[in-house]
Amino acid sequence: GIVRRWSVILNAVPGSRLLIKAGGAASQCVRAHLDAAFAQHGIAANRVLLAGHAPKTEDHLDLYNTVDIALDTFPYHGATTTCEALWMGVPVVTRVGDSHRSRVGLSLLTNIGLPGMVAESDEQYVQLAVRLANDPVRLKRLRTEIPARLRQSILCDPARFTRQLEDALTQAWQVRTSR
């Protein structure tokens, strides 16, 4: 599962920590459950940080300034959280799957020109994250490049997005009616 993959990454990057933002973060039950889950993989509780709901959008987005890499969940990808990470310049590593729920990260990263951040397997997911964590020069470069890539992409250009969607729908209609 995802805890195992995140633990492998934490074990491979000494001194690293994982920030998990969740509505139930203040719950002692959630804390105990996560501590036990990560402990099974040799991760001390002080390496897994929990953050709860931030009442202000600015405070929520400011948390992205405290992380170097966003590790997408699997099989359910982040959508809004992935967009927020990219908006804040945080590179996202994702693991692609076969269904919509596990292809959102692929779509977002491909549309900003970063398909190399998409893993096809659990092993590749870990390798991408560890390699990136050990490359501070690339991390710094991505921190400034990613917001510009996002702003210039089709994701932030509704007119261009709509034209491409219209073209795709027209093509699908033509294929369907030509049978």
Residue map of PLM features:
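Catalytic binding pocket for nucleotide-activated donors in carbohydrate/polymer assembly enzymes
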Residues: 73-158
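Acidic donor-binding loop of glycosyltransferase active sites
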Residues: 63-76
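Beta-sheet entry/capping signal
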Residues: 16-19, 47-49, 68-69, 91-92, ...
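Conserved catalytic-core segment of nucleotide-activated headgroup transferases in glycan assembly
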Residues: 1-56, 63
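C-terminal amphipathic helix plus adjacent low-complexity
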Residues: 8-11, 21-23, 29-36, 49, ...
